[in-house]
């Protein structure tokens, strides 16, 4: 009596954590909302099978068709759903039946190698780092067919060695020569050679059913001989008879059982295996990269991420600007300030708490930013920015402060001017123009604010000082308490800070089609709850952007700065403002003289 041919499970999956990391990256950056099947590849190590069946390994390189050339490569695909509901509602029986039918058709058309393939269905919860997946390798046979073993025999080691060197898991023998198991050769071949996925004695892998179904439909014969090659001494050849109808409906199976031995999906929770800092990094990037899925596919997030921001003034504006930059994924933020945290600061300045009172502001702000996001590169510098019109009192210290400021501006990409005093902004404005940096200015009134980007040589737009006909001078001496403190409606700083950062982000984009056009100035008025966009040209006699001023600073450095601190009039003289003032005074005198002449003539 003949024995029915039995089969072992076709495979056992091993999904490395690197596969999920790569799937996450591709889903976020490449696939996005595209839920079409994507090709996978698995390198089968048929020479080192430690369990009863081959291990189907999936790693980060499984998305790359170029795998280890010495290994047998099996093709597959992954269908990653956009929602967990879609994953759960997928008809798994229908899915594998359709895949089995496709494999049969591919086998009949292209040969036995094309009738074996694996499939992964998955859902990646990118926020929780949890992955749901199910792997299958469809095996099929016609419903009315069965397979009987007529005889078996061992295979000589020499023959096995010659065949094993072939870099394919399936081939056939025609007139004593090994050939590809294509339909052309399957019609006339004497036997098929299969590098078996199973190590159970006398029991081949279930994909043998695929080979027999395809082969028996291509070539009608009484028996079919298959050589099952293995790396141990259990290789054997079997003569098999296919009985019953071989053209009816397909019976398809092949879903892998989970760890409990049930036909159900598996899951992998990587959150406990990951460094919390890495999780924070990826979570920040996740929220931003989701913008590219539908809303802003062309947004340049890398430029925002890699830009180096220098925040001059670590008060209310500075704190909110830093938080907004962090939310946009910026990784490099430097603070500069000359004061310490006062008891009134923590309620208005979100990077400080009560324990920070008395600490240098820049240092405390930097430390707080690193507590919020440990991967940020941040530093705090306590220094006084030399102010035009404020005479030099300690030259060695002020010169050192100038040199540090100059180096900071030179090594950063964008400079935020967020200081209280107008004259504090003059030197950074000149240095920013000299080093050709992006300069963003924000200033507050009681219920109004100004946000602007300084112009450059290309756009001919004005800077913060381009509307002035006098250079800034000492405005801090002899001021009352309400003039020394920033008296403003608390919400104004948030509005100005957020618009300053959004202005920068918009300006950094490659075109106006991404986030719109970047205005030159934004003026907000909270008493009317409105904003106005303005654009003003550069003023040739501006005390900060005038070419003579910039060239003099470039050539003379500290010596010119010292001169400007002691006497702001020298800047007016250099920029041409003095002449403008003289002409204006002369015009006024002429108007007065004209009015006097008219009065005399009337009398």
From Swiss-Prot:
UniProt-listed InterPro entries: Atg7, Atg7_N, Atg7_N_1, Atg7_N_2, ThiF/MoeB/HesA, ThiF_NAD_FAD-bd, Ubiquitin-activating_enz
TM spans (from-to): none
Keywords, comma-separated and alphabetical: Autophagy, Cytoplasm, Protein transport, Transport, Ubl conjugation pathway
Placement of sequence motif GXGXXG motif: 313-318
Signal sequence range: none
GO terms, molecular function: Atg12 activating enzyme activity; Atg8 activating enzyme activity
Source domain of life: Eukaryota
One GO BP annotation of this record: autophagy of mitochondrion
Keyword Protein transport: yes
Annotated active site: 485
Subcellular location per the Swiss-Prot or TrEMBL entry: Cytoplasm; Preautophagosomal structure
SUPFAM superfamilies: Activating enzymes of the ubiquitin-like proteins
CC annotations in GO: phagophore assembly site
Pfam families: ATG7_N, ThiF
Record NCBIfam families: E1_like_apg7
PANTHER family (UniProt xref): UBIQUITIN-ACTIVATING ENZYME E1 (PTHR10953), UBIQUITIN-LIKE MODIFIER-ACTIVATING ENZYME ATG7 (PTHR10953:SF3)
Protein function: E1-like activating enzyme involved in the 2 ubiquitin-like systems required for cytoplasm to vacuole transport (Cvt) and autophagy. Activates ATG12 for its conjugation with ATG5 and ATG8 for its conjugation with phosphatidylethanolamine. Both systems are needed for the ATG8 association to Cvt vesicles and autophagosomes membranes. Autophagy is essential for maintenance of amino acid levels and protein synthesis under nitrogen starvation.
Family under the similarity heading: Belongs to the ATG7 family.
Binding partners and assembly: Homodimer.
Domain notes: The GxGxxG motif is important for the function, possibly through binding with ATP.
Protein name (Swiss-Prot/TrEMBL): Ubiquitin-like modifier-activating enzyme ATG7
Name of the coding gene: ATG7
């Amino acid at each position: 009596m003949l024995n029915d041919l039995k089969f072992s499970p076709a495979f056992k999956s091993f999904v490395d954590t690197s596969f999920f990391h790569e799937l996450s990256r591709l889903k976020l950056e490449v696939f996005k909302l595209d839920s079409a099947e994507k090709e996978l590849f698995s390198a089968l190590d048929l020479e080192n099978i430690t369990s009863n069946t081959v291990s189907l390994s999936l790693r980060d390189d499984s998305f790359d068709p170029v795998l280890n050339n010495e290994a047998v490569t099996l093709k597959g695909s992954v269908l990653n759903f956009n929602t967990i509901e879609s994953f759960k509602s997928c008809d798994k029986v229908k899915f594998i039946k359709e895949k089995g039918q496709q494999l049969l058709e591919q086998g009949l058309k292209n040969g036995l190698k094309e009738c074996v393939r694996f499939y992964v269905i998955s859902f990646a919860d990118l926020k929780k780092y949890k992955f749901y997946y199910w792997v299958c390798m469809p095996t099929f046979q016609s419903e009315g067919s069965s397979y009987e073993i007529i005889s078996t025999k061992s295979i000589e080691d020499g023959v096995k060695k010659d065949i094993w060197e072939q870099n394919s898991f399936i081939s056939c023998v025609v007139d004593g020569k090994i050939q590809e198991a294509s339909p052309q050769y399957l019609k006339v071949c004497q036997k098929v050679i299969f590098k078996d996925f199973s190590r159970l004695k006398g029991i081949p892998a279930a994909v043998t059913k695929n080979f027999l179904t395809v082969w028996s439909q291509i070539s009608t014969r009484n028996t079919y001989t298959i050589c099952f090659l293995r790396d141990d001494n259990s290789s054997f050849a079997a003569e098999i008879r296919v009985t019953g109808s071989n053209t009816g409906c397909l019976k398809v199976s092949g879903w892998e059982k989970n760890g409990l031995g049930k036909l159900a999906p598996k899951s992998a929770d990587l959150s406990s295996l990951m460094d919390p800092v890495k999780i924070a990094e990826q979570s920040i990037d996740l929220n931003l990269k989701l913008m590219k899925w539908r809303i802003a596919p062309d947004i340049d997030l890398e430029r925002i991420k890699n830009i180096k921001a220098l925040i001059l003034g670590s008060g209310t504006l500075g704190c909110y600007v830093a938080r907004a930059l962090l939310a946009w994924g910026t990784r490099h933020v430097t603070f500069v300030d000359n004061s310490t945290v006062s008891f009134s600061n923590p309620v208005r300045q979100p990077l400080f708490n009560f324990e920070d009172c008395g600490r240098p502001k820049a240092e405390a702000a930097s430390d707080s930013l690193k507590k919020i996001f440990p991967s940020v590169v941040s530093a705090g510098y306590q220094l006084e920015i030399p102010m035009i019109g404020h005479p030099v009192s300690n030259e060695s210290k002020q010169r050192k402060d100038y040199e540090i400021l100059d180096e900071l501006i030179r090594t950063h990409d964008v400079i935020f001017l967020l200081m209280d005093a107008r004259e504090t902004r003059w030197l950074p404005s000149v240095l920013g123009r000299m080093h050709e940096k992006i300069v963003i200015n924000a200033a507050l009134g009681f219920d109004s604010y100004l946000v602007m980007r300084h112009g450059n040589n290309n756009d001919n737009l004005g800077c913060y000082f381009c509307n002035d006909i006098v250079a800034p001078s000492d405005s801090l001496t002899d001021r009352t308490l309400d003039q020394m403190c920033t008296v403003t409606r608390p919400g104004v700083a948030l509005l100005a800070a957020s618009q300053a950062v959004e202005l920068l982000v918009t300006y950094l984009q490659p075109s106006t089609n991404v986030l719109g056009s970047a205005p030159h100035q934004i003026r907000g008025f909270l008493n009317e709850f409105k904003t106005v966009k303005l654009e003003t040209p550069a003023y040739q006699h501006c005390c900060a952007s005038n070419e003579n001023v910039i060239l003099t600073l470039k050539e003379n450095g500290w010596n010119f700065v010292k001169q400007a601190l002691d006497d702001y009039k020298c800047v007016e003289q250099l920029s041409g403002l003095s002449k403008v003032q003289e002409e204006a005074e002369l015009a006024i005198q002429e108007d007065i003289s004209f009015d006097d002449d008219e009065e005399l003539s009337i009398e």
